[in-house]
């Protein structure tokens, strides 16, 4: 990849989804992940209809549906009595109205689906063991400084490293 790439700091679901979305629009990207390997971590996440719509656009909607556990309702319960305070049915009527289901899926399943997409795309380069330390904006370009590696130049930078991000702190 060259300096016409969009740089993405963070190889989690957000960073990989950003890379996949950019590839859908024909943009090259370089994903820089601090971890020495991309492994299955995390727990369950809730996916609303809008998330399924996004995953469909990114080409991993079928994977989301295949790995999802569909729930009948969302329940807000009193912590002391355990009684329902409110209940939102998530049945066929909900799915028809929203165009997609509401479900729960393991984070690792979605991460793997997005990672597979990114690895198989000629527009995306994924680099592990690349801790983004800081960046510099230079006119129409950005330079990303990686710990123990040469800096990487690109058109723009997306910070997707999470709450303890060096890039987030600098921005």
Predicted regions and their residues:
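Conserved N-terminal helical subregion
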Residues: 2-6, 23, 52-171
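Conserved N-terminal Rossmann-fold NAD(P)-binding element of oxidoreductases
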Residues: 9-10
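N-terminal Rossmann-fold NAD(P) dinucleotide-binding loop
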Residues: 15-16
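Conserved N-terminal glycine-rich FAD pyrophosphate-binding loop of Rossmann-like flavoproteins
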Residues: 36-56
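Glycine-rich FAD pyrophosphate-binding loop
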Residues: 23-43
């Amino acid at each position: 990849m060259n300096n016409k790439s969009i740089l993405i700091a963070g190889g989690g679901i957000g960073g990989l989804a950003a890379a996949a979305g950019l590839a859908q629009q024909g943009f090259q990207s370089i994903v820089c992940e601090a971890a020495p390997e991309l492994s299955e971590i995390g727990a369950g996440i809730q996916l609303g209809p809008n998330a399924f719509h996004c995953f469909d656009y990114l080409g991993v909607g079928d994977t989301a549906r295949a790995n999802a556990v569909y729930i009948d309702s969302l329940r807000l319960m009193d912590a002391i009595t355990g009684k329902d305070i409110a209940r939102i049915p998530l049945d066929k009527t909900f799915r028809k109205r929203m165009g997609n289901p509401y479900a729960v899926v393991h984070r690792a399943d979605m991460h793997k689906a997005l990672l597979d997409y990114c690895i198989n795309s000629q527009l995306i380069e994924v680099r592990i063991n690349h801790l983004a330390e800081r960046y510099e904006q230079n006119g129409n370009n950005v330079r990303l400084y990686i710990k123990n590696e040469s800096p990487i130049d690109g058109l723009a930078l997306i910070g997707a490293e999470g709450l303890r991000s060096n890039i987030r702190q600098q921005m």
